[in-house]
């Protein structure tokens, strides 16, 4: 395949240094098909753009938060094919054809959301969408996890307010069917 600069400017003779800069600065854009919260979307975007930015900026689903941008805090957690994934580290091209669920796609009557309300988990609330997504994926995988498994599974989701005790309590409540 010819360099992008040759395809953009076929009749121009471009110095090789300038051509290299053009090729680095201009990314090819593709039409990407996404299934988010059961709805089909088509976005024209470079395939290496993080899924987080497509979700927030292009599709205006702003429940998924930007925290660290390097996959360490968990604020950007979404479900991809039922598994918790960091959307800031997921290239949108790799999400094509997969089932994506954001916090907006989790029903209000979901046991985890209801437990979060009953246990009054949020303080500032910024990390809560990611915490809920991580907890929901845990309970989908293991409906009655041990405390050790809860701690292990939730370990990568950070909370500046330190509501970890309430988070664990809410997960326990959700795993018991919300009966406490």
Where are these regions (language model features)?
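Signature of N-terminal electron-transfer/Fe-S-associated modules in redox systems
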Residues: 25-180
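Short, Lys/Arg-enriched N-terminal segments with co-localized hydrophobic residues
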Residues: 13-30
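Generic alpha-helix initiation/capping and coil-helix boundary signal
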Residues: 12-13, 128
């Amino acid at each position: 395949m010819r360099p992008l600069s040759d395809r953009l400017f076929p009749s121009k003779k471009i110095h090789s240094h300038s051509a290299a800069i053009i090729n680095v600065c201009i990314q090819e854009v593709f039409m990407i098909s996404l299934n988010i919260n059961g709805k089909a979307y088509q976005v024209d975007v470079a395939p290496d753009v993080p899924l987080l930015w497509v979700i927030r900026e292009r599709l205006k689903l702003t429940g998924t938060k930007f925290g660290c941008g390097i996959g360490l805090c968990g604020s950007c957690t979404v479900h991809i094919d039922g598994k918790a994934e960091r959307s800031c580290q997921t290239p949108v091209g790799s999400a094509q054809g997969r089932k994506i669920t954001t916090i907006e796609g989790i029903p209000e009557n979901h046991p985890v959301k209801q437990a979060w309300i009953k246990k009054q988990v949020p303080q500032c609330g910024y990390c809560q969408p990611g915490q809920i997504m991580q907890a929901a994926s845990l309970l989908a995988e293991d409906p009655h996890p041990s405390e050790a498994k809860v701690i292990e599974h939730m370990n990568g989701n950070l909370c500046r307010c330190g509501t970890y005790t309430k988070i664990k309590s809410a997960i326990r409540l959700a795993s018991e069917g919300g009966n406490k």
